[in-house]
Regions:
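C-terminal output helix
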Residues: 108-117
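Receiver (REC) domain active-site loop signature in two-component systems and cognate sites
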Residues: 57
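Active-site beta3 strand of CheY-like receiver
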Residues: 46-52
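Charged docking surfaces used in two-component/phosphorelay signaling
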Residues: 17-25
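Short hydrophobic/Thr-rich beta-strand motif most characteristic of the beta2 strand and flanking loop
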Residues: 27-34, 42, 104
Length: 123
């Protein structure tokens, strides 16, 4: 799995940096986008192996970005994982029903994130 590229879409620079550092230390390549609009454009241009998508972003929400990516033949097959700090009951079920391929709770677990990402890549 080494060398696979993960696109991190999050409007919070600290979250992006921590996620990037953990993934790169584990052998993944990374791309970063500071919002949904930039994330969609980067996914269309680079076609990463997996997208970690924040849900709440000011320019384009995670579910809105997901819809655009799933409608585009270049990006429709990329696994897209909801990556959120929301702790509302039923979130995971709602995100999966919306079409996300998985769900990760923030803050990330530095120990668990690489294995979680590998699991999404194998699914």
């Amino acid at each position: 799995m080494a060398g696979q590229v993960i696109l991190i879409v999050d409007d919070n620079a600290r979250n992006r940096k921590l996620t990037r550092d953990v993934l790169e230390f584990s052998g993944f390549g990374t791309l970063e986008a500071a919002g949904g609009v930039e994330g969609v454009a980067m996914a269309q241009e680079h076609v990463p192996d997996l997208v970690l998508m924040d849900i709440r972003m000011p320019d384009l929400s995670g579910p809105e970005a997901l819809k655009l990516l799933k409608e585009d033949s270049r990006t429709a097959e990329i696994p897209i994982v909801a990556h959120t700090s929301s702790t509302m009951r039923g979130d995971e079920e709602r995100f999966l029903a919306d079409g996300f391929d998985g769900y990760l709770q923030k803050p990330i677990s530095v120990r668990e994130l690489p294995d979680q990402v590998r699991g999404f890549l194998r699914a």
